[in-house]
Amino acid sequence: MAATNIPKYNGAITAGALLVSESRHIARLLLNQSSSGDWHQAIVVDNVLQKRSPASAKSQAKLIKARLSLMTPELWKMVESGSADVTTQAVLAAAIKHSRLLADFMDTVIRQHWQTFVPKLSTRDWTDYLKSCAQLDPHVNQWSDATRAKLKQIVYLILSQAGYIDGTRTLKLLPVSVIPEIRAYLIDNNETDVLRCMEITQ
């Protein structure tokens, strides 16, 4: 019975969008098997993420670490030293696995737009999507309007940064090809659900 009370969706993603450049630093710390002291030195003292406050830096570091920790060191290496495109898609893959809210939006809403030849998202898409999420997870009904708006902002920004839409204002859908290196990694590591989300435009 307790398992049914576990939220299917959560708002952890509000801490930041893709955070590509920041993810390079976190991947490096993970690859180096850094101690808690090393993390504090890098994130708080040295401010490698270049945030305005220690609280913001720690919040984003926590989010990125949670994302990347779901993947293997092989992906961390792509994040840390890959090209801009490779790093972006590697970070996106981790973000999709970390956030069911992002994953399902891509796999259902955006996929349907491509299948029905609707070339752009609408403001109503997010509202309707959250209603469908609430049917699967009643916890969604407890989210405030501010939280819903922030989640929309972050998800749309992620889609823009990853090249799936041309901007957060126009919301025009763009075709995306998954880089072979990323695709091979996802297949080899049985991340087919993540790959399915990333291949929605194909």
Residue ranges and their predicted role:
Residues 1-89:
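Eukaryotic partner-binding/assembly regions in large regulatory complexes
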Residues 12-16, 26-29, 33, 85, ...:
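Leucine-rich, amphipathic alpha-helical/linker segments
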Residues 110, 114, 134-143:
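Long, low-complexity intrinsically disordered regions
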